[in-house]
Amino acid sequence: MLMNRIRRWTLLALASLASMATTPALANSSEFETEFDRALGTQARAPKAFAPSYASELERLVALSAEGSRGRIGVAALDLNTGQSVSILGEQRFPMASTSKIAIAATFLEGVDRGRWSLDASYPLLMPMRSQPFSTRVAPVQAGQAMNARQLINIMIARSSNPATDALLRVVGGPQAVNDWAKRAGIKDFRLDRDIATLVRDDGEFDPAVHIDERDSTTPNAMVEMVSGLYQGRWLSQQSRDVLIGAMERTVTGKRRIPALLPENVTVAHKTGSLNNTSSDVGIIRLPDGRTIALAIYATGQGSRLAREQRIASIARTIHDGVIITSPHRISSAR
């Protein structure tokens, strides 16, 4: 009987060695040990436990807040004063939804700085017309009330107006013009494909909690790079920068997201996004002592919009508290 077990173990060993080239080492080890114990009657081993590695204690805490068992959650944050950064699924793509409006506004404002357009010029709102999902490549719109560009930027950011966004998107030349601006700014992993009317009309084709659609998508890392660069005036004049950041500070949407759990003495400039089974918030947190944090949080799934918003609020507070209590001398950059 023992010799039969030994022969069986030998065959298992040879089979395991032969499979190592095509299967993961950990899987081979676990399966081999299980069969070994079964063949020789030895005591089963405790399963191996591997602790995830984090670049800092703050990143570990954010990862706990962003645990995504009920849908993907992507987070990126950067302390503009110290360089401390956090990235949880920061390189994974998420639907931009209305957070893309930051880039659309920036594209128009770059044109203002170059003398192509004026903030005082008026353009009509583009109102969506009734149409069936996917019935046309571009959703039909019609001209509405005319407003000057300064007003359009304010309501497209602060109130997330879709007709105002599409008005300026048409002025700059459509989605490709915005992609070109992002490319000039050196921002990778940013892709705008559709106007807002089409995006909203055709929403629901995929579930972002389990499916990555590269159309109209970005990564949390890319959006943190974008908002930090805009805040620091890297690509726009001071006047244009102030127009955009000022509109973000006046945002009235997403009160249950980034600002929800932050102290009242913290200034928040942000832009929200919402589509089928996804909620997001991207912006700047400015602390009373002058420290400034750029952050982007994209949440999918979680069972409800309220649950996603609660996750976003909790993550934002975790980042805020981590920056407050972490000494710069203990910071480990996670770039």
Where are these regions (language model features)?
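A short, well-structured edge-of-sheet supersecondary motif
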Residues: 57-90, 285-286
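Second-shell loop/turn segments in exported
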Residues: 45-52, 87-95, 137-143, 151-155, ...
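Active-site SXXK
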Residues: 83, 95-125, 295
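Bacterial N-terminal signal peptides that target proteins for export
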Residues: 2-13
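Structured C-terminal helix/loop/strand segments within mature extracytoplasmic catalytic/sensor domains
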Residues: 27-60, 65, 170-171, 175, ...
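Short, well-structured active-site flanking segments
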Residues: 110-129, 175, 179, 237-240
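Bacterial N-terminal signal peptides
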Residues: 12-21
